Amino acid sequence: TRIYWKKQVNVDFHTQDPDFDSYMKWVSFQPFLRRLFGCSFLPHHDYGRGGRGWRDLWQDCLSLLLMNPQNVGAMIEKNYGGVRIDGTNATIIGDGDGNFIADRNGIARVWMDHALWPLITTSLYINQTGDIEILKKQVPYFKDAQTMRGTEIDTLWNDAYGNKQRTEDGQVYTGSVLEHILIQQLAAF
């Protein structure tokens, strides 16, 4: 198992300070620990609840891109399933990749930086891998009662509807990753 974990962290650092090099190697290992154990190991960063949020997903992908970019594409694609059709996103990550929860306690939250993380992560992914085709991948939109960028409630929505945006005839609506990016970037204006 030691060999396995050493292969997972395949980034080396060489500075004048061996302690700093070791620390940076440890930081590179954090995304693996987060995926296994959640964020509870960083209580001073408000992760003490043990949950993972929107930023966590994308920042983990950024870190993993340094070590294993080929396997990050599927994660990025699933992450876009947390975007709502109004450009906002689910704030809490459920169990497993691509499973989202609107929020923890019924309070609508729209964060200014949430559209930034998918954009810069996808950009780095494309630059690292050359996989521009990811922009064409079809992904569903997240749906819950929040609408109009968290300022209104969709009174027609209920749990039976599910958490995917649907068309008028009840089919799950999908849009390309590029569409998701554009909606997130432009809907705030």
Whereabouts are the PLM-identified features?
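Generic detector of bulky aromatic hydrophobic side chains
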Residues: 28, 56-58, 186-189
